[in-house]
Amino acid sequence: MIIVLKQHAPADKVQAFCKELNSMGYQINDSVGSDTHILGLIGDTKALAESWVLANPVVETCRRVSEPYKKANRKFHPDDTVVDVGGHKIGGGYFAVMSGPCSVESKEQITYVAQRVQAAGASILRGGAFKPRTSPYSFQGLRAEGLELLQEARKVTGQPIVTELMNNEHIPLFLDAKVDMIQIGARNMQNFELLKAVGKLNVPVLLKRGLSSTLEELVMSAEYIMAEGNPNVVLCERGIRTFETSMRNTLDISAVPMLKKMTHLPVVIDPSHAAGIAFMVPALAQAAVAVGADGLMIETHNDPAKAKSDGAQSLTPDQFDDLMKTIKPELEFFGKTLN
């Protein structure tokens, strides 16, 4: 149930009302917007009479919510959430570009790429230290050493880093490395124990949509994180599996406006994994801006032909420069601030 409070309702009476609701067993998601103050009740409200709620002098109106997600629901939180990643904002009109190699391969590689993408306008450095691969014989990443190299690149550029967490056992390593944003990959989108674990951390989370997951399933995974106390979740559309075989995945561009309607969380697009082919990345990136995304995640490699993973979808630094020159005017046209 959503309860909309009257403007300028006395704080002591609102507090007393909330205390009474708590005593009845309901959790309260308190959302204060620019024009509205909303209490989102979490729990079974079937027995809670609307007439009883409306009788309270601080209540303007109330309505029941049928969706299973509450904390992520835009009805509970009408204003856009803005997630801060190392001083760079995502959402609410702020647009962030995350770029870097699929895999961290060496100090020279990650530092060079970090400097190039930062110069072009990327505010957040992406790079894989632990790599989930389809084949057990493929390069699995430098692991702990990769985290160390990401830290060294951060010292050089000052960029916050985002990298993928694959299991709960690695959390201490990520905390020691002071990872600025934890990525939950598509294959782990419904690893509920992992979601609950990152929900207990004070670190922003980039949650990627699973290859065959519905939008509601994606939002419910975000709900797992938020239910544990971490509100800083960014959703990522990275392509879904369809019958089409000419590209790696199919970018569900319609996911962005629908997710914006369903939830208040920022939504970014990963055109690299969506296409799997480098020449398509700039066009999909432009489409992402036009459809209202809050950011991009793009793979850039100093020498894609020699990349240890996902070279076919990686841009060169020069190609990334050109992409950024293309989307900057587009961002300005749509009133987004590159942050």
Residue spans of the language-model regions?
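Conserved anion-binding
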Residues: A129-R133, R187-S254
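Glycine-enriched alpha-helix->loop->beta-strand junction motifs that scaffold or abut catalytic
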Residues: G121, L173-I182, A197-V205, M226-N232, ...
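Non-catalytic terminal accessory/regulatory regions of metabolic enzymes
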Residues: M1-V97
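Active-site mouth loops of central-metabolism enzymes
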Residues: F95-Y112, P136-Q140, P160-E164, G185-A186, ...
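Hydrophobic faces of well-ordered beta-strands that scaffold small-molecule active sites
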Residues: F95-P101, L125-G127, I161-T163, D180-I184, ...
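Alpha-helix-loop-beta-strand connector modules within alpha/beta enzyme cores
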Residues: F139-T163, A197-P204, I253-V267, Q313-K336
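Glycine-rich, proline-tolerant flexible connector loops at the mouths of alpha/beta enzymes
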Residues: R126-A144, H301-S314
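N-terminal active-site wall of soluble small-molecule enzyme domains
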Residues: P132-I182, N191-L194
